């Protein structure tokens, strides 16, 4: 077994875990074949040794004591940290400032760890930090489906209380074409198992994944699955991939066509219209999303969310283009910002300067986002 190399952190986390301590249990993704995801493509998967994960927890506990000035923190000299320890110190300091309420287990699917080992990690976290309110993790539906209900309930009892699952879509056609490695039925099975275990469940829906051809199927099939699962959160994510990415490697007949912002708004509208009998919180909490004001709880906010989407769809083409540019440039946050004369004038100026019109707005914005992605800004 390789020697302990120090505290580790993985590359990503959900936006909702911005204040969480990031604790790495695994490296990269055990599946790593989804056509739309490039995060781990150049890296192989590995499980970190249990002893290393427990040592990471002890390291953070010691650093927190030292940063607080606790008299029993005699074994850590903050001014003499090695380069490998600086990352842990930064993580401990940031977590301490945020209130030390939540922990996110990395990387892409921490539940592939042996249940007994994961439970030991959770118990050690609770022993070291008894005031933690939330411990969360990414998980794949295929992984959850293989875990016994008893083990899931034991994980929940040990403190794991929220799971983030990349549903992406519940269309079996699309799931096969994007090589997701799961099915609609398995998505439903996994979601229900998490709910029965008493954990919160966030399901992520990838808007635009079906292109224009499969937009309606994506919306309807995904809504049908969500209606059976009734997750605590439904979170929308706008698909962003580099040009040249083969999104449908599992199909010889179909090629993905990038949908416009209007098509994606219509897709989200259709999906929300199809949601019935559930009490999920809907969130659009990512910088890529055009309409971040899509935020509400079902069923009471359903009509308000529908009205927001319909308002964007019904805008005259020129105003719709202004809003698209205003959102991507940071001038607008909400549809109502179109009514602010100063901000709107600035956006109109941007459109004139760069020759942006209703006919080319999606292409122009796509080119801008592609440049930013290639520069590593996202």
Predicted region positions:
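Auxiliary Fe-S-binding modules of radical SAM enzymes
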Residues: 1-17, 227, 233-235, 241-378
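Canonical Radical SAM [4Fe-4S] cluster-binding loop centered on the CxxxCxxC motif
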Residues: 12-76
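Hydrophobic faces of well-ordered beta-strands that scaffold small-molecule active sites
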Residues: 21-23, 101-105, 135-137, 163-165, ...
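Conserved, mostly hydrophobic/aromatic
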Residues: 29, 37, 53, 105, ...
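Aromatic/hydrophobic pocket-lining residues that form the small-molecule binding cavity
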Residues: 53, 118, 148, 187, ...
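Conserved SAM/AdoMet-binding glycine-rich loop
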Residues: 62-196
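Conserved strand-turn element in the central/C-terminal portion of the radical SAM core barrel
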Residues: 142, 166-176, 193-218, 237-243, ...
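Catalytic cores of alpha/beta
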Residues: 147-153, 211-228
């Amino acid at each position: 077994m390789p020697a302990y190399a120090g505290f580790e952190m993985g590359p990503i986390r959900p936006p909702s875990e911005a204040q969480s301590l990031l604790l790495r249990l695994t490296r990269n993704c055990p599946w790593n074949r989804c056509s739309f995801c490039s995060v781990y493509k150049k890296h192989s998967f590995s499980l970190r040794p249990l002893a290393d994960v427990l040592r990471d927890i002890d390291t953070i506990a010691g650093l927190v004591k030292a940063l607080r000035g606790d008299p029993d923190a005699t074994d850590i000299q903050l001014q003499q940290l090695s380069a490998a320890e600086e990352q842990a110190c930064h993580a401990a300091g940031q977590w301490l400032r945020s209130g030390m309420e939540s922990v996110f287990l990395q990387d892409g699917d921490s539940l592939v760890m042996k249940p007994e080992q994961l439970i030991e990690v959770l118990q050690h976290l609770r022993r070291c930090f008894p005031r933690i309110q939330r411990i969360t993790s990414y998980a794949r539906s295929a992984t959850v489906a293989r875990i016994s209900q008893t083990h899931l309930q034991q994980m929940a009892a040990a403190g794991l209380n929220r799971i983030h699952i990349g549903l992406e879509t519940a269309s079996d056609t699309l799931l096969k074409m994007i090589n997701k490695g799961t099915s609609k039925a398995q998505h439903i099975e996994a979601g229900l198992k998490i709910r029965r275990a008493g954990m919160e469940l966030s399901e992520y829906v990838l808007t635009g994944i079906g292109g224009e051809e499969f937009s309606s199927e994506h919306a309807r099939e995904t809504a049908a699955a969500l209606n059976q699962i009734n997750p605590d959160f439904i979170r929308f994510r706008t698909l962003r991939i580099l040009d040249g990415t083969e999104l449908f490697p599992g199909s010889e007949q179909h090629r993905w066509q990038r949908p416009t912002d209007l098509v994606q708004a219509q897709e989200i509208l259709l999906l929300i219209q199809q949601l019935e009998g559930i009490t999920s919180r809907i969130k659009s909490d990512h910088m890529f999303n055009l309409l971040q004001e899509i935020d509400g709880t079902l069923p009471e906010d359903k009509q308000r969310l529908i009205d927001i989407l319909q308002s964007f769809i019904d805008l005259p083409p020129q105003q719709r283009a202004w809003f698209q540019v205003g959102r991507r440039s940071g001038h607008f946050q909400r549809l109502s910002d179109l009514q602010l004369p100063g901000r709107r004038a600035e956006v109109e100026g941007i459109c004139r300067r760069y020759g942006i019109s209703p006919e080319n707005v999606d292409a122009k914005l796509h080119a801008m986002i592609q440049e930013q992605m290639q520069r590593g800004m996202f």
